[in-house]
């Protein structure tokens, strides 16, 4: 296909897959000698994050089963979210003509709450962890479940924390993209832990192609304020996470999520968000111990949604220079 002549019937045709992958970019200035680290730029997806993939997969499943669409007129989507999945679902809901209600933790950055409303979501803010705990009946998950149960004619909850299509999205798209883009040479994959759909899907696909591929999860230290990701100690009730599919879990001081994100911007020209800073630091430490021939890092989203958090954590930044 001649992509230079391609046009699109609507924005969802820009969603990534093996024929239309998100970019894979080599880092050059910050990588230890003898290693190659590549960033998969998920903020280039149409709604701005890796969560576009799972959101689309979950909505399409609901439509196929008649839970959304002409068979259920007026029914919309309700979902607990720390921001990115909610943004993706809200944008897709707008394109498909569905209402959207997002249950959002109070500590989520203001930028994300505003963007959800810009895209048309009704936002209900609840005291909760930055990344809601899977299986919880309280906080944002409890609120979303209450709406879905009490008003089932109005709302359906995809439930990214337990939905197998969250994993399947990465088996179907992200994994095959990486395999094809690296010509099957990928040796390491680095990603974070949130709902765990990304890490589980990547592991299932890539280890199916080559069991020697190392899948490394990078987590923030406890007490962190990095939205959308979690420490593995919080995953005891996760319905998607299988520790047998992860080769190693690296813990990084959460403050580095922000300072390393700034480092990536200043030396590699990448507008990487704090979770990407954390992932890169984990990959860099791995490469310092032993060469990483072909390491792929999932850079989940960009820094713009975290400007207020960057201001708090990166020394020398000023809102009014």
Features from the language model and the residues they span:
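PLP-dependent amino-acid enzyme catalytic core
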Residues: 1-321
């Amino acid at each position: 296909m001649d992509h230079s002549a391609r046009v699109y019937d609507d924005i969802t045709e820009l969603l990534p897959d093996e024929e239309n992958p998100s970019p894979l970019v080599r880092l050059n200035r910050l990588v230890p000698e003898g290693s190659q680290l590549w960033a998969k730029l998920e903020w280039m997806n149409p709604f701005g994050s890796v969560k576009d993939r799972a959101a689309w997969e979950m909505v399409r499943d609901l439509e196929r089963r008649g839970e959304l669409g002409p068979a259920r007129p007026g029914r919309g989507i309700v979902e607990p979210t720390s921001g990115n999945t909610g943004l993706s679902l809200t944008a897709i809901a707008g394109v498909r003509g569905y209402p959207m209600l997002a249950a959002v933790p109070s500590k989520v950055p203001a930028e994300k709450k505003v963007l959800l409303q810009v895209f048309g979501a009704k936002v209900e803010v609840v005291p909760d962890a930055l990344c809601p705990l899977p299986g919880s009946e309280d906080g944002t998950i409890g609120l979303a479940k209450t709406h879905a149960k009490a008003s089932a004619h109005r709302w359906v909850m995809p439930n990214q924390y337990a939905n197998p299509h969250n994993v399947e999205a990465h088996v179907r798209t992200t994994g095959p993209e990486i395999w094809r883009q690296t010509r099957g040479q990928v040796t390491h994959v680095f990603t974070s832990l949130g709902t765990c759909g990304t890490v589980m899907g990547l592991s299932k696909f890539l280890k199916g192609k080559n069991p020697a591929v190392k899948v490394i999860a990078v987590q923030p230290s406890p007490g962190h304020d990095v939205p959308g990701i979690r420490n593995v100690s919080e995953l005891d009730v996760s319905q998607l996470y299988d520790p047998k599919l992860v080769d190693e879990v690296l813990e990084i001081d959460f403050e580095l999520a922000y300072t390393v994100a700034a480092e990536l911007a200043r030396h590699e020209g990448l507008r990487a968000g704090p979770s990407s800073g954390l992932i890169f630091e984990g990959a860099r430490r791995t490469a310092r111990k032993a060469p990483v021939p072909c390491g792929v890092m999932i850079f989940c989203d960009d820094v713009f949604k975290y400007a207020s958090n960057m201001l708090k954590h990166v020394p020398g930044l000023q809102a009014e220079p």
